[in-house]
């Protein structure tokens, strides 16, 4: 929290949140508003232990389609991020101006890199979560098939991490 927010009341801070962030907060789901992106989509972050609850609530609010799930690395020694882009494919009176939302989970590289799988909420998250695991090493708890999807099963390391050291030698294997 910055210095300006220290002197503000909790009501003033709640008013600074985006519409969806404020609604989650009022429903008891702790989150941090990250403002809006360059095209006006509301961004928010949640702790890993609140992700499943937050996404379940967002689906109830009308964000009924997981358009994209992925990961990225902020840089060597910095955090890994699992992100979720949800959109609404139906009109909801309460949220008619809001059609999409982005949720991020920030993970410290040297701590537990686990987040809940959203497979039970969105079946389409299956391969997206597997790809994020395969490239960044973020584990998705309770995923029905937590295996590599792009790299060979015995591959070591996470190729899209900024601190990944590329091996000098690759053993090519015939697929047959």
From Swiss-Prot:
First-listed, main subcellular location of the protein, grouped into a coarse class: membrane
GO cellular component term of the entry, any: plasma membrane-derived thylakoid membrane
UniProt cross-references to InterPro entries, sorted A to Z: NADH_DH_suC, NADH_quin_OxRdtase_su_C/D-like, NADH_UbQ_OxRdtase_30kDa_su, NADH_UbQ_OxRdtase_CS
EC number: 7.1.1.-
Coiled coil: none
Protein's GO biological process: photosynthesis, light reaction
NCBIfam families named among the record's database cross-references: PRK12494.1 (NF009141)
Domain of life from the UniProt record: Bacteria
Membrane topology (UniProt): Peripheral membrane protein
Any single Pfam family the record assigns to this protein: Complex1_30kDa
Membrane spanning stretches: none
Protein name, UniProt field: NAD(P)H-quinone oxidoreductase subunit J
Family per similarity comment: Belongs to the complex I 30 kDa subunit family.
Organism (species): Prochlorococcus marinus (strain MIT 9515)
Gene Ontology MF: a single term: quinone binding
Keywords associated with the record: Membrane, NAD, NADP, Plastoquinone, Quinone, Thylakoid, Translocase, Transport
Reactions catalysed, as given in the entry: a plastoquinone + NADH + (n+1) H(+)(in) = a plastoquinol + NAD(+) + n H(+)(out); a plastoquinone + NADPH + (n+1) H(+)(in) = a plastoquinol + NADP(+) + n H(+)(out)
PANTHER family according to UniProt: NADH DEHYDROGENASE [UBIQUINONE] IRON-SULFUR PROTEIN 3, MITOCHONDRIAL, NADH DEHYDROGENASE UBIQUINONE IRON-SULFUR PROTEIN 3
Enzyme class: translocase
Gene: ndhJ
Record localization: Cellular thylakoid membrane
Annotated function: NDH-1 shuttles electrons from an unknown electron donor, via FMN and iron-sulfur (Fe-S) centers, to quinones in the respiratory and/or the photosynthetic chain. The immediate electron acceptor for the enzyme in this species is believed to be plastoquinone. Couples the redox reaction to proton translocation, and thus conserves the redox energy in a proton gradient. Cyanobacterial NDH-1 also plays a role in inorganic carbon-concentration.
Quaternary structure note: NDH-1 can be composed of about 15 different subunits; different subcomplexes with different compositions have been identified which probably have different functions.
